Amino acid sequence: MSSANQANRGEGLTLRQAALIAGFSYLLMPVTFAEFYVFPKLLVPGNIEQTAQNIAAHGRLFFVAILCHFITLTLDVIIAWALYALLAPVNRSLSLLTAWFRLVYTAVALSGLLNLVTVFRLLHTPDYLTLFGAQQLHAQVKLLLSSFRYDFSMGLVIFGIHLALLGYLIFNSSYIPRILGILLSLLGIGWIIYCLGPYLYPTAPLGFIPLAGFGELLFPLWLVIRGWKIPSGLQVRLFNTADLACSRSSKRRTDSSRRSTPVEGISGSAE
């Protein structure tokens, strides 16, 4: 077997496989449990004392919410990889850029998640209450919870750019409905406006935009329900190591031929 064939073994990922991996990873995200069950139960708007008491009394539930966010961000990395493979045939460089935007969003969101970890530690370590006192401790908890939301909001700006580029790639593909591309691009622009709007236009009514975010679920549903119908013959090499192996082999042959060719100046002086 040639070195090029050896280098290419195990690297192929069909578009069908990439679609199913991305779709199931989307649907397995547990962040909705944290955002729509745990946080409304524990976080009381405008009452940091009650919020701190709730987190202290239900520490395990609060930690589960943190874990849900962490699992979701881990799945985001898998989705970035799968979507890159799925859309590389459309435009490999733009697909790579789109994946990088999702990875950067994941990193920003993960840094924000660390604020919740600090909140958990502050409220479940008795020494901190003795050291800071209740009032100062509650002030720190309030600051950390606000920082989590602000960091996550800035991450959503980057996520919006990712969705806009993703929609463009889908619109220009021949194996995913164009309407999904239009929808994702509009959602991406919507997230950017929603996150930056309070700073640019504080009075603008933008509260409806997060509800439109549920439209993003149409994409993973299509990937799971219809993605298996994408022709399996379409395959992507994620890393072009076959060409790299051929290039290295050619370079070795060139170097070998150079060493075997006598240099005229040296042979003449030897005579």
Feature annotation, model-predicted:
Residues 257, 261-270:
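Short, intrinsically disordered C-terminal tails of secreted or membrane-associated proteins
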